[in-house]
Amino acid sequence: MRKNKLEKMLKFPCLFTYKVIGLAQPELVDKIVKIIQCKLPGDYVPQIKSSNKGNYLSISITICANTFEEIESLYYELSNINIVRMVL
């Protein structure tokens, strides 16, 4: 299987930070942490920033990934949260 550029750059296990941008709703952070907890149990401390108008939240959360597949799987699951607008 062909590796992409990101996968080639990472050495596992590694710390990987997701930045999730979504609607400023109270359940956003809980949904993000719940999805990550299901795949990689642990204590997570998300960093939360609000947009200037308060319509959006930016949540940064760091995981310890063991495989590239974990990173990819979480990316797709976080992207599928209905109030999420972008995952970086």
Curated annotation (Swiss-Prot):
Family to which the UniProt record says this protein belongs: Belongs to the UPF0250 family.
Organism encoding this protein: Buchnera aphidicola subsp. Baizongia pistaciae (strain Bp)
GO CC field: cytosol
Gene3D superfamilies according to UniProt: 3.30.70.260
InterPro entries: UPF0250_YbeD-like (IPR007454), YbeD-like_sf (IPR027471)
UniProt name for this protein: UPF0250 protein bbp_432
